[in-house]
Amino acid sequence: MARTATRFSCTACGESLPKWEGRCPSCDAWGTVQEEATTLSAARRGHAAPREVVALADVDALEAERIATGLGELDRVLGGGIVPGSLVLLGGEPGVGKSTLLTMALAAIAQRTSALLVTGEESAAQVRLRAERIGGAGDIRVVAETDLDGVVATIAKERPAVCVVDSVQTLWTADLASAPGSVAQVREAAGALLRVAKEHGVAIILVGHVTKDGAVAGPKVLEHLVDAVLLFEGERGGELRILRAAKNRFGATSELGVFAMTGRGLEAVEDPSALLGRDELGAVGSVVACTLEGSRPLLLEVQALVSTSCLLYTSPSP
């Protein structure tokens, strides 16, 4: 017999509370504590079987072969490719090109192994239109689904090498009374996908939108669950896109990937320093400095403009 339990959580930081409060004691945000209703099964409480314990020295230390995405800039940030069984979160503002980036990666992966795209924001026909624009609609398998249980069952049945879920905010489960995109729904979806990824060795990439507060997929509870957090950034109206890792359990977090958005999708920018105008280097008021982002040197140009003034300035009195 199932019973319903009520708890409270902060929509800003994800902190769980035993009762409602006007201000969250963890992040000091006002009016962010909301009620959550969860369903508990009485048949499962207190009936968990003990698990087998092994010595750490007896565990096989075989390093799993990474799955190359076919995009050099993405592989650079990931540390050489996607690790099987890992859970990766790709965050960025809406419209920056997250779906385009992952569709291109899936198209390259599908030529060598199985790849699955779970879409909750678009229909299968809309996904095909985008894939045809970038020239990779052939081998990608796609399913349009937002029910969490259905998504988990599909991944467990298909067992693709790489699966992309676009996006995590659209997933929901009937076990929770809150709306899709809430703290409880996002946390439950990430936990369920983490379990299926580890159990079946499927590399899962979650797409999460950045909120107005700068958090990826809502509160930061997701960032503690996943193995890697990638941030995809770009200026509004500009063509350059920057990919960086905020967290990576299987590689460095200092690497940087640079892309350019074109009519055929994203193109890798292997030498960002070449974007500087060679003819303008050495001009008056301009200086070029070199900085290091991971293993990549980057040239940065700083400009200063100085002109004469018509105003009269008096010298300070001694």
Residue locations for each model-derived region?
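Conserved small/polar residues in nucleotide/adenosyl-binding loops
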Residues: 313-318
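Conserved nucleotide-binding/hydrolysis micro-motifs of P-loop NTPases
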Residues: 96, 121-125, 146-149, 169-171, ...
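Short, small/acidic-rich helices and loops at N termini and domain boundaries
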Residues: 2-45
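Conserved P-loop NTPase nucleotide-binding/switch module
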Residues: 162-244
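Conserved P-loop NTPase
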Residues: 40, 44-56, 157-158, 169, ...
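Extended interfacial segments that mediate partner engagement and assembly in macromolecular machines
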Residues: 37-117, 121, 125-126, 144-145, ...
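Conserved inter-motif catalytic segment of the P-loop NTP-binding fold
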Residues: 85, 93-96, 100-105, 109-195
